[in-house]
């Protein structure tokens, strides 16, 4: 993982503070928007890599859900909150895990890519390809740098915990190495100013 760490970033390891901060930054609303827009199958098989507190479950109806995160605190919170609605695993998603899992309709990378080095992204995408159904979709959401960006939005994004925030061209370049078809959207948030970038990628 490619992280910045200061006192504020450490505070976000608390599930309550992290959840409150997400709501303040409208992260919950943009997550809901992209999941409702892109997940259409009934009872979908979902793999949520970097699932955090597991809150994607709030916006998906009756999924078969597997969530991975390396934060023990987040995973324990998710297990208590969602109980049998999903399987939550405190470990890295890697080659060993692939053998234990079914094929998925949707794989989620919500707020994950900008925390990874380019080498880590390529390795992760390779593993995702092996786990995704032929007609499945990868859905991503990350902050992005754009031309003529709101100053405050750029300031906030530059202070994100993730150190590998990219432009649209840079994000798409990496995804196109693994996926033939992709649809991308940029969302400019007015209050509090922020810029989000989402991709839906298919084989």
Give the location of each predicted region.
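Hydrophobic adenine-recognition pocket in adenosine-nucleotide-binding enzymes
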Residues: 112
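A conserved beta-strand element that flanks and buttresses the S-adenosyl-L-methionine
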Residues: 108
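Class I (Rossmann-like) S-adenosyl-L-methionine-dependent methyltransferase catalytic domain
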Residues: 1-100, 116-123, 127, 137-203
């Amino acid at each position: 993982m490619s992280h910045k760490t200061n006192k504020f970033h450490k505070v976000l390891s608390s599930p309550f503070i992290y959840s409150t901060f997400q709501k303040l930054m409208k992260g919950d609303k943009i997550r809901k928007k992209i999941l409702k827009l892109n997940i259409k199958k009934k009872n979908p098989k979902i793999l949520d890599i970097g699932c955090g507190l597991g809150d994607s479950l709030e916006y998906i109806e009756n999924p078969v859900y597997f969530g991975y995160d390396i934060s023990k605190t987040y995973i324990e919170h998710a297990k208590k909150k969602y109980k049998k609605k999903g399987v939550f695993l405190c470990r890295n998603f890697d080659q060993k895990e692939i053998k234990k899992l079914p094929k998925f309709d949707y794989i989620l990378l919500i707020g994950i890519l900008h925390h990874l080095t380019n080498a880590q992204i390529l390795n992760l995408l390779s593993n995702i390809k092996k786990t995704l159904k032929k007609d499945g979709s990868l859905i991503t959401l990350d902050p992005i740098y754009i031309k003529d960006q709101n100053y405050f939005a750029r300031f906030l994004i530059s202070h994100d915990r993730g150190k590998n925030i990219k432009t649209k061209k840079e994000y798409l370049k990496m995804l196109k190495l693994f996926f033939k078809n992709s649809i991308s959207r940029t969302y400019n948030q007015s209050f509090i100013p922020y810029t989000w970038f989402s991709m839906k990628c298919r084989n």
